[in-house]
């Protein structure tokens, strides 16, 4: 209802500024508005025994923000990871978030995002292998990463959710593998890791000419289109500000509530921080805790929009 009501007005505001939205964004909204509606097509399912018929509306199958399709994909992803991908070993979640300027850069440059993920993966993998006491030439670890682009307030916040095996495999001379489990990272180790990650990421961006540092400050060197509406929208979203309309530039009003069970379970204070980089590693599952692991997989693969968290006040505010 909210999208259907305000999407045309939003497009009109953008066009009046002589700005444009990328085609994939417009398509995401338009197909979402057709999702689950019988008038846009359906399948007729009929039971062979009782002859009961049921109509199933076509879905948009988009990956942006459709709550229905996103929830279905969340369940499928979690089942796949637990049943077919993640081994029956201890698993730890590592969550890395970035400074505001880098969130903007990563949101607009998938090639850079891929390179940064590779840097982060190597830093954590090397740490696990060394801590396991195994030679690098004989050791392997593993991880699955889900990149989330949203925060709890639907703000733009590119960050990594990485599920690492909590240890390393050692390949013996006979070809067999032996697993070496490691202890949870200490506060000192987290600070060391996040410092290494920040230095290597910044160094890579400088070599690519995307980040310029002088004696006083650092800034991004980006070639941006002035008529691209997404640039302005992303800049405001990252800093929790209203992007268009009469209240443009104002901070979004937010309420701090009692943490949900997800926040309580998956948001501990085991964290290392430096210069806007933040590395969490306080959540882990034991070998036999497959149900907890599935809950964790559902949590990190959840869609951006949760209809349970949306409500309209009597004044019409969201």
Named regions from a protein language model:
Residues 1-318:
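Beta->alpha loop/short-helix hinge microenvironment recognizer with preference
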């Amino acid at each position: 209802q909210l999208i259907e009501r305000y999407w045309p007005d939003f497009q009109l505001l953008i066009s009046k500024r002589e700005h444009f939205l990328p085609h994939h964004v417009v398509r995401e909204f338009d197909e979402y508005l057709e999702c689950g509606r019988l008038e846009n097509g359906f399948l007729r399912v009929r039971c062979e025994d009782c002859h009961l018929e049921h109509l199933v509306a076509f879905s948009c199958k988009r990956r942006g923000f459709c709550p229905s399709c996103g929830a279905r994909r969340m369940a499928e992803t979690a089942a796949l990871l637990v049943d077919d991908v993640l081994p029956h070993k201890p698993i730890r979640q590592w969550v890395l978030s970035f400074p505001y300027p880098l969130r903007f850069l990563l949101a607009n440059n998938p090639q850079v995002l891929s390179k940064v993920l590779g840097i982060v993966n190597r830093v954590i993998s090397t740490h696990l292998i060394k801590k396991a006491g195994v030679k690098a030439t004989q050791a392997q670890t593993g991880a699955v990463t889900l990149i989330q682009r949203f925060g709890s307030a639907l703000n733009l916040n590119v960050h990594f959710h990485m599920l690492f095996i909590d240890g390393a495999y050692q390949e013996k001379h006979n070809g067999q593998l032996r697993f070496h489990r490691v202890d949870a990272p200490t506060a000192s180790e987290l600070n060391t890791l996040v410092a290494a990650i920040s230095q290597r990421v910044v160094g890579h961006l400088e070599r690519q000419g995307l980040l310029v540092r002088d004696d006083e400050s650092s800034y991004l060197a980006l070639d941006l289109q002035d008529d691209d509406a997404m640039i302005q929208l992303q800049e405001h979203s990252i800093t929790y500000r209203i992007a268009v309309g009469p209240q443009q530039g104002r901070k979004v009003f937010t309420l701090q509530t009692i943490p949900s069970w997800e926040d309580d379970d998956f948001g501990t204070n085991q964290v290392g921080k430096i210069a806007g980089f933040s590395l969490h590693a306080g959540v882990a599952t034991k070998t036999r805790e497959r149900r907890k692991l599935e809950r964790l997989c559902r949590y990190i693969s959840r869609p951006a929009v949760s209809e349970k968290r949306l409500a309209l006040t009597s004044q019409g505010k969201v």
